[in-house]
From Swiss-Prot:
Gene3D superfamilies: ATP synthase, F1 complex, epsilon subunit superfamily, mitochondrial. The lineage of its organism: Eukaryota, Metazoa, Chordata, Craniata, Vertebrata. Component of the ATP synthase complex composed at least of ATP5F1A/subunit alpha, ATP5F1B/subunit beta, ATP5MC1/subunit c (homooctomer), MT-ATP6/subunit a, MT-ATP8/subunit 8, ATP5ME/subunit e, ATP5MF/subunit f, ATP5MG/subunit g, ATP5MK/subunit k, ATP5MJ/subunit j, ATP5F1C/subunit gamma, ATP5F1D/subunit delta, ATP5F1E/subunit epsilon, ATP5PF/subunit F6, ATP5PB/subunit b, ATP5PD/subunit d, ATP5PO/subunit OSCP. The modification N6-acetyllysine is found at K21, K32, K37, K44. This is ATP synthase F(1) complex subunit epsilon, mitochondrial. SUPFAM superfamilies: Epsilon subunit of mitochondrial F1F0-ATP synthase. Its main location: mitochondrion. The gene is Atp5f1e.
Length: 52
């Protein structure tokens, strides 16, 4: 059985992004500001130096 998001041609990441946006849009205004703050993504880049 194929997942319905896969049948629609979506990756799981895109599907979860759509779901998260729908949840944030449905929030009451008092909770929406906090949800919008945390909705961004962040990455950390670490350069590894080779020590001999």
């Amino acid at each position: 059985m194929v997942a319905y998001w896969r049948q629609a041609g979506l990756s799981y990441i895109r599907f979860s992004q759509i779901c998260a946006k729908a949840v944030r849009d449905a929030l009451k205004t008092e909770f929406k500001a906090n949800a919008e703050k945390t909705s961004g993504s962040s990455i950390k880049i670490v350069k590894v130096s080779k020590k001999e």
